[in-house]
């Protein structure tokens, strides 16, 4: 399997072949705030205060010193963080190639345009419904939320790279096909369908045309895994290679990945110049198959990446 064909642009064969604790840092994800104006039923709040902007700048600069290629700002809802534009501009100034934002899609068009002007070129937005009644419920009962989100997805898709995440729960799983078709009508770049962590590990049968599924690499990858009986989560490799050149940060701490952090896992260590070495030691000593968080939540695409990294190392 060529990782580049899956659709997650930060996960490639070249990266798996070359990843070490001293290679270019390929990706960083920074939690800016736990605040959110939605109350999605499946969301696991990260808690804690907004990150101090000077601490956020410190993290970005430390990552940039390691040649950071891709950064993602998330939360909570990162558009509620007052210093977001300043951090985006700093990332661009330091040479970061791709700047991504995980957002619920509720901000104003003016704010999203200002973020594009500052340097954001990747938007990840949740789309868990295909109609206003269901969409407002999935946002925690916020009336009118779905219409705002849908229109923002539509116009952002015309000017930027936009993926939508369809989180399936018992409330919306029966409308998976309608949601996919609606997302397609908005002009998105890709569609990430995934069951909520609380709802189990399998996807429902996706009864849309092969032509539509194959239009979206990530959707096609997930649908093929479902047809072959593969779960979205679980079954990790013994060693995690993603930690070598990838980092999730919240406050003063760095974590193996964003999922590990959201599931309540312990940080690898404190933010500082020795982070890459700490992550190397974690990679060498941590058995992911014996870690309940990894064993139950590692995404299949991460398993494929780690498997590819192992195969390259065995050849060497």
How should each PLM-predicted stretch be described?
Residues 48-102, 106-121:
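Conserved Radical SAM active-site core
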């Amino acid at each position: 399997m060529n990782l580049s064909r899956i659709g997650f642009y930060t996960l490639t064969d070249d990266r798996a072949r070359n990843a070490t604790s001293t290679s270019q840092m390929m990706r960083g994800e920074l939690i800016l705030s736990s605040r959110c104006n939605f109350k999605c039923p499946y969301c696991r709040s990260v808690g804690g205060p907004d990150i101090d902007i000077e601490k956020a700048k410190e993290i970005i600069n430390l990552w940039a010193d390691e040649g950071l290629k891709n950064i993602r700002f998330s939360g909570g809802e990162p558009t509620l963080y007052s210093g977001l534009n300043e951090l985006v501009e700093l990332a661009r100034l330091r040479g970061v190639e791709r700047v991504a934002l995980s957002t619920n899609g509720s901000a104003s068009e003016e704010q999203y345009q200002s973020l594009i002007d500052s340097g954001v070129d990747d938007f990840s937005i949740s789309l868990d419904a295909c109609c206003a009644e269901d969409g407002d419920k999935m946002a925690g009962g916020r009336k009118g939320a779905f219409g705002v989100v849908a229109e923002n997805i539509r116009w952002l898709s015309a000017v930027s790279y936009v993926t939508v995440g369809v989180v399936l729960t018992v409330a919306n799983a029966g409308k998976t096909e309608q949601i996919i078709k609606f997302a397609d009508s908005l002009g998105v770049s890709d569609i990430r369908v995934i069951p909520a962590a609380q709802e189990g590990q399998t996807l429902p049968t996706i009864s849309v045309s092969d032509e539509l599924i194959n239009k979206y690499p990530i959707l096609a990858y997930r649908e093929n895994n479902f047809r072959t009986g593969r779960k979205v989560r679980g079954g990790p490799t013994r060693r995690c290679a993603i930690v070598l050149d990838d980092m999730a940060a919240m406050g003063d701490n760095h974590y193996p990945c964003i999922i590990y952090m959201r599931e309540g896992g312990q940080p690898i260590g404190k933010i500082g110049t020795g982070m890459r070495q700490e992550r190397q030691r974690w990679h060498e000593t941590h058995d992911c198959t014996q870690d309940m968080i990894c064993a139950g939540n590692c995404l299949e695409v991460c398993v494929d990446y780690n498997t590819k990294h192992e195969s390259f190392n065995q050849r060497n």
